[in-house]
């Protein structure tokens, strides 16, 4: 069984994604979940760490990074089940961007 450590634990303390990943690796974890609270500023560092660090991204929690218009951790800011069509469409777009 593989145990993954979530970036939810330390993403708020880091502006640089590489430093965030290194902190988790230094605790002995090699499987990492990318949490919904990641910001655009984390992405370049995470991608750079993929080239230099020994870890696997085991899962993605919701879409990421958080949309720039969302100022706090809000994993349910755009729901697929929303009664508002615009919110449902935004959830789909953000999820597709995450997958790409």
Model-predicted segments: where are they?
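Divalent metal-binding pocket/active-site signature
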Residues: 100
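N-terminal pre-domain/capping segments
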Residues: 1-97
């Amino acid at each position: 069984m593989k145990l993954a450590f979530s970036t939810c634990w330390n993403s708020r303390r880091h502006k640089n994604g590489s430093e965030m990943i290194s902190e988790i690796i230094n605790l002995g974890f090699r499987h990492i979940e990318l949490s919904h609270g990641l910001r655009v500023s984390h992405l370049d560092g995470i991608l750079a760490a993929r080239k230099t660090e020994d870890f696997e991204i085991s899962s993605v929690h919701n879409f990421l990074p958080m949309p720039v218009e969302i100022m706090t951790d809000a994993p349910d800011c755009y729901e697929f089940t929303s009664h508002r069509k615009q919110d449902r469409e935004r959830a789909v777009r953000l999820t597709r961007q995450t997958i790409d």
